[in-house]
């Protein structure tokens, strides 16, 4: 420990002797002034950035594509002089980039037209040059009216610092084409959605219960899959049409035919469940057990319904039809002419009734 303290004291003594010398005094004076200036500049920059709003801070720190970013090699200084009775001979146009921030005040003013044999044409100005500086005043962020007032106040002598605006003109043309393409895409998309809605209505009828395709955005319409099958309304219409056709087919059968009343109705004693099948000739109700039904129906075909004196059907068939068709009205069926004539012949009326009742 004593050796370390001795070395420390010796180094401190040498440093004190150096600081007491004239060389250190001149060096400290020079570096001290520089350090104070740097600290003052850093403090001023920090105070300036701290007083800006948050949006302005990001804009001041991340600003790009500004007129001040161009190097001096890309700049051109032009002096235009005119007489009292003539003009400079150029037209300007202000342009704001479309991809800039909303809080950005960046705006370019460029020369859009040059008259031949004018002072501007003789001075070397070209169409597309960007006006970066006019008479020592930077035009960055100036509006069209401010630039015009600045040119008019310059008198007959105009000193313009220009930049090559070829890239800006190309970007302007591309952005104009982009806007046209966006408008065309919007129109075509509206037509596509209208056609898709018409197709949906043609397949499903009334599209009131379906989600409207016009209220969907691009993402929902891109996820719109294939159209579903027939809705419940179509199934109900098929069911009603089949019932009405079956009803008309049953009502067309009368007791006038000698073959009797033929039908494809079979009763299932265990379940009583029926299923519907549609064929090209007629519609009939068959039970779910197809094989048993075919065996039973083969023995029950061509069955005649006996007509009683009151002209109504037998209780068995009447009960079956009432249980199947529910509220369908029953049509009274008249007997054949031969049976009505046999009733007036004595001795034959009872025999005919007994013979038909055995069936």
From Swiss-Prot:
PROSITE patterns: PDZ
GO biological process: regulation of cell adhesion
Impact noted for substituting residue 329 to S: Found in a renal cell carcinoma case; somatic mutation
Record's keyword terms, sorted: Coiled coil, Cytoplasm, Endosome
UniProt xrefs under InterPro entries: Intracell_Traff_Signaling_Reg (IPR052122), PDZ (IPR001478), PDZ_sf (IPR036034)
Domain spans labelled PDZ: 77-166
Superkingdom, natural source: Eukaryota
SUPFAM superfamilies: PDZ domain-like
Statement: the UniProt record of this protein carries the keyword Metal-binding: no
Induction line: By TNF and bacterial lipopolysaccharides (LPS).
Expression by tissue: Expressed in lymph nodes, thymus, spleen, lung, peripheral blood leukocytes and bone marrow.
Function, as annotated: By its binding to cytohesin-1 (CYTH1), it modifies activation of ARFs by CYTH1 and its precise function may be to sequester CYTH1 in the cytoplasm.
PANTHER family associated with the record: CYTOHESIN-INTERACTING PROTEIN, GENERAL RECEPTOR FOR PHOSPHOINOSITIDES 1-ASSOCIATED SCAFFOLD PROTEIN-RELATED
Assembly behavior: Interacts with CYTH1 and SNX27.
Protein name, as recorded: Cytohesin-interacting protein
